[in-house]
Amino acid sequence: MRLSVIAAFVLTTLALLVMSSLLVKAYAQSEQSKPLKCQTGALIGYGGTIFGLADVCTNGNLIDVGITTNYIPQPGKVFEAWLVDDLSKGSDYALSMGKILNSGTLRFQEVMNNATTYTDIVMTQEPAGDLSPLPSWSNAVAQTWLLPPFGQ
């Protein structure tokens, strides 16, 4: 009796693992089948200087961001890119996409509940090894505004 209960438990656990894996794959495929809407924007720095370019694509849930720049941060600093939820009317929430690599590029891909809530991409110059999860707004170096479907 005890052995049959253990066997039933093991088989049920294995079935659940297989089913959850299949469901995750099906969800990922359904998200990829939605059409992507893409835009390219200039990252505008002080005085209207073009700091770099941001390519952004979304289908509402998946977001894919590619950033390029020719600028190099000051010694001991790094450039960090942020997706921001409307600096004036939204929550002001900033999601770090990570630091710009030495090659001057950044690639960010994420599946989100609502990727279109974001309205801006902001670049800041942060201390290397900075432990703060918050952006240093006083050290913002460039920004681009996202067009619809973003900001919804």
Each model region followed by its residue ranges:
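Hydrophobic alpha-helical membrane-insertion segments, chiefly the h-region
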Residues: 13-23
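N-terminal targeting/export leaders
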Residues: 2-9, 22-152
